[in-house]
């Protein structure tokens, strides 16, 4: 995904079972962040930082969506435990993750693995990166 590219229309289903589309955010800016795993230290810190600045970001016109390959049930527990005020998309088939180019090789302490690459996109009012 490059600057200026359009984000796919269908984003996926969140922890409450709601299906999200880019058209739901027409005319709004979106922080679309991808994270590897619910309830892990780094992912929890990232989500809580966005939670802690949620009001400020909304005042600037941003909506927030988190995405990982975890299940909706896992997202529901994570969102409840951390009091997250934004949707978490359960991309279990990795359709959005792969379309956005955030699945690939990563080096973890000298060991090459394949997984979700922690990435954040700022999406403009027209649905472009």
PLM segments and residue spans:
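Chalcogenol-based redox active-site neighborhoods
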Residues: 1-129
């Amino acid at each position: 995904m490059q600057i200026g590219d359009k984000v796919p229309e269908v984003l996926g289903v969140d922890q409450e079972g709601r299906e999200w589309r880019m058209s739901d955010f027409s005319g709004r800016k979106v922080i679309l962040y991808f994270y590897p795993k619910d309830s892990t230290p780094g992912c929890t810190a990232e989500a809580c930082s966005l939670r802690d600045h949620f009001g400020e970001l909304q005042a600037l016109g941003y909506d927030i969506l988190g995405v990982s390959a975890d299940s909706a049930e896992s997202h529901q527990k994570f969102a409840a435990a951390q009091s997250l005020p934004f949707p978490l998309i359960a991309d279990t088939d990795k359709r959005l993750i792969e379309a956005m180019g955030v699945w690939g090789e990563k080096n973890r302490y000298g060991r090459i693995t394949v997984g979700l690459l922690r990435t954040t996109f700022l999406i403009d009012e027209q649905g472009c990166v």
